[in-house]
Curated annotation (Swiss-Prot):
It comes from Vibrio parahaemolyticus serotype O3:K6 (strain RIMD 2210633). Keywords: Hydrolase. Gene3D superfamilies: 3.60.21.10. It catalyses: P(1),P(4)-bis(5'-adenosyl) tetraphosphate + H2O = 2 ADP + 2 H(+). It comes from the Bacteria. HAMAP family: ApaH. It is an enzyme of class 3 (hydrolase). This is Bis(5'-nucleosyl)-tetraphosphatase, symmetrical. CDD domains: MPP_ApaH. Its EC number is 3.6.1.41. Belongs to the Ap4A hydrolase family.
Amino acid sequence: MATYIVGDIQGCFDELQQLLKRVNFSTQHDQLWLAGDLVARGPKSLETLRFVKSLGDSAKVVLGNHDLHLLAVSYGLKKRKDKDKTTPIFLAKDREELLSWLAKQPLLAEHDEFVMCHAGISPQWDLETARQCAREVERIIQGEELPWLLKNMYSNLPDLWDDSLEGLDRYRYIINAFTRMRFCFSDGRLDMDCKLPPQEVTGDQLVPWFELPHRIPLEKTVLFGHWAALQGYIDEKVIGLDTGCVWGGSLTMIRWEDKQLFTQDALD
């Protein structure tokens, strides 16, 4: 059995199929972990949702910011972005089934040796806090209050974690950390604006969330996507897998057992 983790697909279905074919992926013996943003600007978001859903227990998925946006659009709470190629999802006969399945996916998935989320884990959280925060918001996403949360989650504030946060402030921070975070200010506040590669950031105010000096160390490796400008990032405890396939880059997948990387250049 092999465990494969893949970065942001964003509807780049054909590239995903090429990667899985290359490693002879077997639903009977292997597992595919997907680091969020299954849908958005790529040409085959509908096919991607259907395929990943069809994998059943052979797939582990976490929600990304584009996945949450798709759910918000489905409730009429947000407009579809011009660059998103998600209209076929809303025209599909199985749209309700697909969207219901998507809403049941977690913000944080855990393996014996690693955890996976879309953007990262707040530098102020230890692993147990991250688990608890994820479960708090997942209960809402998977319940009757989902439309309320989707309507009210869009905000860059609060930008600093405090365990005394309550209600929407607490949920917004948790969602932003798991699905939108890239840089932090030196005091730990989240920056929601800068998308540059770290080497292009001048000054010492902005630091990648995983390089913040006072970040709480985690006992497991964190695998994440979201940050295409990193073009992949690997160290002992952090692995970034988004290499911008939807932007003309590549789709990257890692086999956990031997840490071998597999890449597929964008086909379109």
